[in-house]
Amino acid sequence: DVYKRQKQMYEELWKYALDRAKNGACDMLVMDEFMAADRYGLIPHEEAIQFLKEKPEGLEVVLTGRDPSEDLIRIADYVSEIRKVKHPFDCGVYARRGIEY
């Protein structure tokens, strides 16, 4: 089952990211498309909220993606919206490996 494999992969990545963040291996943790993983239940939402509330001092966390949950917005220091003005897709260029995915 594709969803089950994806969920397992995301959970492994989530655990890896938490471990790196908690052991001081990084000053900044960037999790691209985090909002989609959260929205589709690919990572444990309550665990993510707890981590963000208790993250190590000095650690900057950047979460990207569309439609963040209200509780993520509430605990965030910054929330930005980015809108597309122009994109190669508009000219028929489809998603490219290493760029859009």
Q: Where are the model-predicted features located?
A:
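Loop/turn-to-beta-strand initiation segments
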Residues: 25-28, 56-63
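Conserved ATPase-coupling elements of RecA-like P-loop NTPase cores
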Residues: 36-47, 72-73
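Conserved alpha-helical scaffold flanking the Walker A/P-loop in AAA+ ATPase domains
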Residues: 14-22
